[in-house]
UniProtKB/Swiss-Prot annotation:
One of its GO terms (cellular component) is nucleus. Its main location: nucleus. Keywords: DNA damage, DNA repair, Nucleus, Phosphoprotein. The modification Phosphoserine is found at S105, S165, S168, S170, S355, S356. One of its GO terms (biological process) is chromatin organization. The lineage of its organism: Eukaryota, Metazoa, Chordata, Craniata, Vertebrata. This is PWWP domain-containing DNA repair factor 3A. GO terms for molecular function: nucleosome binding. Gene3D superfamilies: 2.30.30.140, 6.10.300.20. Interacts with TP53BP1 (via BRCT domain); the interaction is not dependent on its phosphorylation status. Binds nucleosomes. Interacts with trimethylated 'Lys-36' of histone H3 (H3K36me3) (in vitro). It comes from Rattus norvegicus. It is found in: Nucleus.
Amino acid sequence: MTDAKYVLCRWEKRLWPAKVLARTETSAKNKRKKEFFLDVQILSLKEKIQVKSSAVEALQKSHIENIAAFLASQNEVPATPLEELTYRRSLRVALDVLNERTSLSPESHPVENGSTPSQKGKPDADMASQVSSAPSPSFLSEDDQAVAAQCASKRRWECSPKSLSPLSASEEDLRCKVDPKTGLSESGALGTEVPAPTGDESQNGSGSQLDHGQESTTKKRQRNSGEKPARRGKAESGLSKGDSVAESGGQASSCVALASPRLPSQTWEGDPCAGVEGCDPVESSGNIRPLLDSERSKGRLTKRPRLDGGRNPLPRHLGTRTVGAVPSRRSCSGEVTTLRRAGDSDRPEEADPMSSEESTGFKSVHSLLEEEEEEEEEEEEEEEPPRILLYHEPRSFEVGMLVWLKYQKYPFWPAVVKSVRRRDKKASVLFIEGNMNPKGRGITVSLRRLKHFDCKEKHALLDRAKEDFAQAIGWCVSLITDYRVRLGCGSFAGSFLEYYAADISYPVRKSIQQDVLGTRFPQLGKGDPEEPMGDSRLGQWRPCRKVLPDRSRAARDKANQKLVEYIVKAKGAESHLRAILHSRKPSRWLKTFLSSNQYVTCMETYLEDEAQLDEVVEYLQGVCRDMDGEMPARGSGDRIRFILDVLLPEAIICAISAVEAVDYKTAEQKYLRGPTLSYREKEIFDNELLEERNRRRR
């Protein structure tokens, strides 16, 4: 374990692939036992941790596949979408690293001498078990003798039961011949035989075309995991036409030429099949059936290419290794061609009618191989990426989740879950608005009233909200979309409320915050959250709760009563009013009254109670009567307007300054702001305006 470069360790309750950075040895209590600690870095992350060597495993491809299968079998996502994407990206990087190491390992590249580590074990053992007991020439090496014997024995085993009738010597010799263009595979199996055309030029050309086509096709099959049975069947039928024309006796010597490629000149001096048992016409006819029976009894009869006109399917692992098995096959091509020509010249009557079939077979085989190669290349280009699990809608509500909530008579509106109380089955949510306070308390509602933001009814809820609040709901959706995009691309990591309070969301927020008057939001979040919904189904009972009256107006009237008592009963503002009339104190209200030519029909009196206002006005009228000669010339002509525009504001400002113990400027600013209205009062006022507008439209 200490030698592994990549390991699988546990971090944050999950198995993560990691890269080993360093190894440290620490002394344990028992001196004989030594503990090793590994400094590892989580793949695709910058997180570095230290783990015990006994708590990790060497990273293997099977581990990644098991984890992926486990994730695919889960119904619920165990973590947030961002954490899940991070974890799967780390697994993807680990899988790429393992594939890269596999492709760069020496086992995947063929050795030039024709022997690979896989060839030196199992294939040699198979060939050794299948070598005939007949003597072989002395100039052949042990490996070459095994290959030659395999050539004979395998060709005899590949015959079907229908072709086991007594054969002539030329037909038996035909089972030993091998085209040097095809050669032997690494596992010792013979390649497909290529028939020789009659013409001098067509023989070499067609053979080379088929050779390149087979090599490219087998390379594609080695890379891809599957085959097309239909295409393979067509190619086999095309090859069977070419295989049926190989009936010359001189071609039997190619088996020895392939078995000993180092000494081709010595091979042709004596009997061409002297060292191979399968090439003896006398012995082979009697040994075919016993060999077949013995192999069937052992269960080792394998499907190989047949030379009697048919062909069994070629296994997937036989293909590109043909080149490495016979390094000097090109040197034998000239001699084999000469022998074939000599054999064909002995029987000219058979060669002429077969030439047309051979040329047709070569063309069909070549075209089929090219089509198969093109289709497999298209499959590689259209290879789908690794499967990614779709995001399933969570069944429970968590903190920070985006939801829909129906509030009073307003449509469903997006909100954020601030807290969840599982025992009470309630959640505190905060509606998404233009002036939303991320630190606000929100309202408490039942979990049954919440809907996930990405629920099936999402589009219907959006359409319903757009009927009355098109611009507002569009802004909310754009804000949520921008948050998810930044979360996915990694430019922001945090909850939605943190995103709303951060500067990164300002470009989206300012479009609404700078246009408060033009965008109308529903009045949400400060009423009774458990009020029954307006669109509840008929017959469905909902608890009816009594709405308490608004106490903010009563509180303001009680505070204003102190001002009235200060003005009327205590007469505390009378000296201030006389100083203004005698021009001892400046007054913006008197200056505006004298310079204004317009008659104001509406004014802010600050006092909301009519009785309080009448009491103050009567007192000010008495003051005017007492100071009739001291009033300004213009004020004497319009006494009511002078009282409302000058004396009433000055008296109230003086009372605010005295009662609340503030200076005159602060009291004047409070008077200009007017009474502070509550949220419910604004809502009632807006509802009255909407009802009035709807009534006029009707």
